[in-house]
Amino acid sequence: MSNNLSESILQKRIKRFKSIKRGYYSLIAIISLYILSLLSPIWINDKPLIIRYANNQYDSGEKFEDINNNEIWDLKEPFNDQVKYFFPAIWDLLDFIPGISYPIYESKYFNQTTNKFEVDFRELDETCENNNSGNFVIMPIYPYHPHEDLKDELDEIYEDLNNNGEYDAGEPFTDENNDEVWTQNNPPTKPDGFGGRHLLGTDNTGRDVFARVIDGFKVSITFAVICTFLSYSIGIIIGGTLGYFGGKVDLFGVRLMEIFSALPFLFIVMILSGFMQPNLFILASILVFLSGWIGISYYIRGEFYREKAKDYVSAAVSMGASNNSVMFKHILPNALTPVITYAPFAIIGYIGTLNMLDLLGYGLQPPAASWGEILKQALENLDNWHMLIFPIIAMTITLFMITFIGEAIREAFDPKVYSRLR
């Protein structure tokens, strides 16, 4: 009994949230899947985890010279064919950190005779397996990158395995006019299943659909979280200021919000996309600036109007607390309940907005992975059912889980359940 009395309202709400199993397990699932997607470069990638390689060449270095004219070579060790270890996938994972850039692995160092400057890691893997040189390559579990264009390699990789006159995983070149002029035939290829090359097939440019669906999950959640964080930060400051000070400040602020609410959101995004190719952060900033902060501002404004009339606020003011202290230390914690319950549904809205813009061609530009971009390709040719079904399944499951989280938070944070300071 004493433990129950000593629990804070927040602890009771968290305990209540955990008791709502569908929301609690959905939160664990979303967080786990998001962490896996962030770590996808080490399990979904065309770059190896580890390369051990000795290239049978003398490594470049300083020349051996008799620097002191004493007929003694001053550098005594000869040039050796040193064994070197490389970790391309790890560098790819850390590439987002400022100051860290992905190194270029030249094909000539790995003795590949090709016109490509960078090494073909899958070909290197096959070479190391066929040669007993001690070199080895450890590829990720799924050796395809979501941005990798496989179209140029189809004539080399896809073979007529069944001797039926057709490329079994998608014919890359076709004689469309029967004039012996072979033109490039873009994929997609249908799913190969667990025993094949591409689990969920490829899209119109030869990119692996499974890799892009996983990366699309990461992009969607990251985009939605960034938008929610920015909109909440701006909305709390603006809404809190309007609700606390009121008067002319509130009048001017509400008129400003009405002006922004009247802006043609989609047309402005279309115009801006015509001038630039927005990346994830720029697109998130545009959405938040145009409309994302308005709804949160209204919520916070109303809560501040209600809370500032209560006795604890008057007590804080009478004790000499500053406006910032009263607003963000005393009022804000008591005004966050409706905002917290709104957050999961805001995330759902931003995920839908991103994929809608990508579907229309005004969102993230290829090769950025997005469910909407895959659906855009599928709608251009409905025969490509695999590009329609799998992104929809991924999006549906994700939105359902976030909805369960939102319902659980709303029930756990219901102010009617616990008494509040009056």
Question: Where on the chain are the PLM-derived regions?
Answer:
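Gly/Trp-centered helix-boundary motif
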Residues: 1-232, 236, 241, 367, ...
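Alpha-helical transmembrane segments of integral membrane proteins
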Residues: 202-422
